[in-house]
Curated annotation (Swiss-Prot):
GO cellular component, one term: cytoplasm
Pfam family, one: HSP33
Family statement: Belongs to the HSP33 family.
Disulfide bonds: 229-231, 262-265
Protein name according to UniProt: 33 kDa chaperonin
Record-linked InterPro entries: Heat_shock_Hsp33, Heat_shock_Hsp33_C, Heat_shock_Hsp33_N, Hsp33_helix_hairpin_bin_dom_sf
Organism: Pectobacterium atrosepticum (strain SCRI 1043 / ATCC BAA-672)
Gene Ontology BP annotations: protein refolding
HAMAP family for the chain: HslO
Compartment(s): Cytoplasm
Length: 289
């Protein structure tokens, strides 16, 4: 099975572009060190595929966060990705989730938040109600409301050789182009026939040929997708310095050290009294980076 990659492609005879992504290794890394219920694992896979596809639509350096939150047993699920296709994600539960639970059963009364943060420029946030039955349907509504670009997402998750796998495709009318709705619907119907097993096991070019062998398609150089966490000891130290001396001293007196745990990658950062003394000395100048 090939490593995780995103492939962009363009239909020469239609004002429509597409993306195909596989995120198997990244998906498995996100699930490592977490004992999520099966339905939550599936949901995170869908969100990971969707975030990768959305991030690839960015025309600038920056990142996208796709977040689900509500009052159901799934309190929060979030995937963060950037223009380099570096992904991470986590979920937080506040109740039991049965196998096969639907999106609405997990989230309850909630919403989907898409946050776009350019490296240079203003942050943008869009909020979408959970009107669709799936993450893909909710995001299609987001595109229709925010960008008014006909967009379809085709997301597949499952198991292959005992491991969780996820992949998907995106079709979108090119901005400032007048694509015939019938043309877009025709391509969407072709894309909807893609089988999960094809996405999980076949090279991207073969999948695209099977779907569009009667169309003229240009496929661009692929981009690697990988799990990447941005936590660090210095970031944890900076966070500690936002606490009062009394709070820090009480934590050290109680446990002998402070254990800061990254929910995304599972790394533990330990700080004892000597570490705190050194951090306080450093923080008297500039914050750590």
């Amino acid at each position: 099975m090939a490593h995780d990659q995103l492939h962009r492609y363009l239909f020469e005879n239609y004002a429509v572009r597409g993306e195909l992504v596989t995120v198997n290794e990244t998906y498995q890394r996100i699930l490592t060190n977490h004992d999520y219920p099966a339905a939550v694992q599936t949901l995170l896979g869908e969100m990971l595929v969707a975030t990768s596809l959305l991030t690839a639509t960015l025309k600038f350096s920056g990142d996208i966060t796709v977040q689900l939150q509500g009052d159901g047993p799934l309190k929060l699920a979030v995937i963060n990705g950037n223009h380099l296709q570096q992904m991470r994600g986590v979920a937080r539960l506040q109740g039991d989730i049965a196998p096969g639970s639907s999106l609405k059963e997990m989230v309850g009364n909630g919403y989907l938040v898409i946050t776009i943060t350019p490296t240079d420029g203003e942050r943008y946030q869009g909020v979408v109600g959970l009107e669709g039955e799936t993450v893909a349907e909710c995001l299609e509504s987001y595109f229709q409301q925010s960008e008014q670009l006909p967009t379809r997402l085709f997301i597949r998750t499952g198991q292959h050789e005992g491991n969780p796998v996820a992949a998907g495709m995106l079709l979108q009318v090119l901005p400032a182009q007048d694509a015939e709705r019938n043309d877009f619907d025709h391509l969407a119907q072709l894309t909807a026939t893609v089988k999960a097993e094809e996405l999980f096991t076949l090279p991207a070019n073969e999948v695209l040929y099977r779907l569009y062998h009667q169309e003229e398609v240009t496929v661009y150089e692929p981009q690697d997708v990988e799990f990447q966490c941005h936590c660090s000891r210095d970031r944890c130290a900076n966070a500690l310095m936002t606490l009062s001396d009394q709070e820090i001293n009480e934590m050290i007196e109680q446990d002998g050290e402070i254990d800061m745990h990254c929910d995304y990658c599972g790394t533990h950062y330990l700080f004892n009294s000597l570490d705190i003394r050194a951090i306080r000395h450093d923080s008297s100048g500039n914050l750590l980076h």
